[in-house]
């Protein structure tokens, strides 16, 4: 266990009245309960920093770890946790809501300002479709069973962020969307091979450019930028895979010129 992890665990234990508990035992308990998941020490430290910074209690679900699909975790603050950090802010001076079937408006008042911070969230933008299993079966979620309550939570949390500058913390609904988007990106956008171009391939390209009376700056780099959909301003920015494709294009052009001649 790292020193930073032990120190943060000790601060949490002291704050919740468990300072007599060994830090290692506390961490083990947290890993098995509120912070359950395959979290690295760095991720665990991040969770403890958030918990201590906002005075949240993991054993009452004010903060907990939400597992993502990359063997990591997303720190989630429950509605009770959001309520705590809002009410404990020294400048908080109350809030009210206006809600109908289409939207919910939250107003938070600060003691040091003349006008309230106001945020409106819309049902058609926030509501989520039912979850689906791999077999295609729909599972009713909170947006189906309690849509107005969920929208009210959304409005309160977004308004609190603007009013007090809360950052780096999410509610469960946001965490689920983050995990879904991360998984989609990982599945649809595989990591690009960034192996640099080797000297042999570069020499072949240069030879063909001379033979075709073309240049890097005027001809090949603009073409590569268009084909690979990124701004490429120097030959050194090409990867080996991209250079091979560019070489293939030049060879095709050379063959066409030879036939035409």
UniProtKB/Swiss-Prot annotation:
GO terms for biological process: DNA recombination. Transmembrane segments: none annotated. The keyword DNA-binding applies. Keywords: DNA recombination, DNA-binding. It holds the Pfam family RecT. GO terms for molecular function: DNA binding. The keyword DNA-binding applies. It comes from the Viruses. InterPro entries: Phage_lambda_Bet, RecT_fam. Gene bet protein functions in general recombination and in the late, rolling-circle mode of lambda DNA replication. Has a function similar to that of E.coli recT. It is a single-stranded DNA binding protein that can promote renaturation of DNA. This is Recombination protein bet.
